[in-house]
Design a protein with these regions (language model features):
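Structural marker of alpha-solenoid helical repeat scaffolds
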Residues: 18, 52-53, 86-88, 121
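Generic long, charged, amphipathic alpha-helical segments
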Residues: 52, 56-80, 84-86
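Residue-level recognition of tetratricopeptide repeat
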Residues: 31-32, 66, 100
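Structural signature of tandem alpha-helical TPR/SEL1-like repeats
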Residues: 1-14, 36-49, 71-83, 106-117
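Terminal, low-structured helical/coil segments at or just beyond the last alpha-helical repeat
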Residues: 38, 109-138
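Canonical tetratricopeptide repeat
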Residues: 28, 63, 97, 131-134
Length: 138
């Protein structure tokens, strides 16, 4: 099924205009910006605000980690993504995110471990192709 990210982005932006404190919309919009070419600094700001309101939320930790990954701040990315993976060990996208952060940070063994776990959980997730390519390179 095709995902309509521009429609989702528009929806989340409207929701935040009405209720700027609605954390799920802030988190999801931050992720869309990070993943689909939006302003990465705006994404980071949204995710940080979401984190302040729900500091224990694993989805927000994943979003923050992926934004730091996109900003090439791999050490910080790993911290958040490890937290997300510890809280949601069966989420292949989270394992993929953590594996890619390890990969870019030069942690080859941990990258291989996390990317393999992601693909063992599911072979179809956003980033599965990139995970397979990275594993071939390891």
């Amino acid at each position: 099924r095709e995902k309509n990210y521009s429609k989702a982005q528009e929806y989340y932006e409207k929701v935040l205009t009405i209720n700027p404190n609605f954390v799920p919309a802030a988190n999801n919009l931050a992720y869309i910006y990070a993943e689909h070419g939006g302003n990465i600094d705006v994404a980071l700001n949204l995710a940080q605000k979401a984190r302040e309101k729900l500091p224990e939320d694993a989805n927000i930790a994943d979003t923050l980690g992926w934004i730091y990954y996109r900003k090439n701040v791999f050490g910080t990315a790993i911290t958040y993504l490890k937290e997300a993976a510890d809280k949601m060990p069966e989420q292949p996208v989270v394992r993929y995110h953590l594996g890619m952060a390890y990969y870019k940070n030069g942690n080859r063994d941990l990258a291989r471990q996390e990317l393999s776990k992601a693909l063992a959980i599911s072979t179809e997730f956003d980033g599965a192709g990139e995970a397979r390519k990275a594993l071939e390179d390891l």
